[in-house]
């Protein structure tokens, strides 16, 4: 008998340089559950060679609510990863 591994699939929205590095403005990623934003960043780095440039603690939001790297991910979440913003 084989054990099934629960997964969580999320939609990742990428902006500015992050989208340029990965070559798309959104991707779907499946992760072993339980998963956090930190796990998501690690998975992106494994799946996309240029994503190794992503910071370990990117500005992020889950379903349009500010999140941290320790925030848990749930099935169907929409996770936005935003590069640092500058203004004047």
Model-derived regions, located:
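Ubiquitin-like/PB1-type beta-grasp interaction modules and other compact soluble beta-rich domains
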Residues: 1-87
């Amino acid at each position: 008998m084989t054990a099934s591994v629960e997964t969580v699939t999320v939609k990742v929205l990428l902006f500015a340089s992050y989208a340029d590095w990965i070559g798309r403005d959104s991707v779907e990623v499946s992760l072993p559950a339980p998963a956090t934003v930190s796990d998501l960043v690690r998975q992106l780095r494994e799946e996309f060679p240029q994503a190794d440039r992503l910071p370990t603690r990117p500005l992020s939001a889950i379903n349009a609510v500010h999140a941290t790297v320790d925030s848990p991910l749930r099935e169907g979440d929409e996770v936005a990863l935003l590069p640092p913003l500058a203004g004047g």
